[in-house]
Amino acid sequence: MFLLHEYDIFWTFLIIASLIPILAFWISGLLAPISEGPEKLSSYESGIEPMGGAWLQFRIRYYMFALVFVVFDVETVFLYPWAMSFDVLGVSVFIEAFIFVLILVVGLVYAWRKGALEWS
C-alpha cells in the first residue's frame, strides 16, 4: 500500500517553489517599462563607453580546460562525504569509490593524451 498522502508537504513545497519565480518573471514583464533603441542594444561596461564589440571569440582550448576542471571538481564533491564516513561504511563502498576514482583517472589520462590540459 502506497502512502502518497505523506508526500503532500513535498508536493506543496515543489509547487510553491515553482510558482514563485514564474510569478516574479510574469509580474516584472507586466510592470517593466518597454524601451527600445540603439542605447538598449549597446553593451554596458559599468558606465564607461564601450571599447569595441560585445562579441569576443575564445579558443576552444579554454572550454576543454574548464570542462576538465568541472569534472574533477564534481569528483571532489562526491568523494568528500565518502571520506568523512569511511569508518562506518563497508568494504563494498570502498571498492565502489575505488572504481569511481579509477574511471576518473582513465578520463584524466585520455584528456591529457588528447592535449586538453595544454595551454600552448
Swiss-Prot record:
Domain of life assignment: Eukaryota
The reaction(s) this protein catalyses: a plastoquinone + NADH + (n+1) H(+)(in) = a plastoquinol + NAD(+) + n H(+)(out); a plastoquinone + NADPH + (n+1) H(+)(in) = a plastoquinol + NADP(+) + n H(+)(out)
Main location: plastid
Entry annotated with the keyword NADP: yes
A biological process from GO: photosynthesis, light reaction
Pfam family, one: Oxidored_q4
Enzyme class: translocase
Translocase among keywords: yes
Classification via Gene3D superfamilies: NADH:ubiquinone/plastoquinone oxidoreductase, chain 3
EC annotation from Swiss-Prot or TrEMBL: 7.1.1.-
Transmembrane segments: 9-29, 64-84, 88-108
Record key words, sorted: Chloroplast, Membrane, NAD, NADP, Plastid, Plastoquinone, Quinone, Thylakoid, Translocase, Transmembrane, Transmembrane helix, Transport
A GO MF label: quinone binding
Subunit comment: NDH is composed of at least 16 different subunits, 5 of which are encoded in the nucleus.
PANTHER family, sorted: NADH-UBIQUINONE OXIDOREDUCTASE CHAIN 3
Family as reported in the entry's similarity comment: Belongs to the complex I subunit 3 family.
Record's protein name: NAD(P)H-quinone oxidoreductase subunit 3, chloroplastic
Organism name: Brachypodium distachyon (Purple false brome)
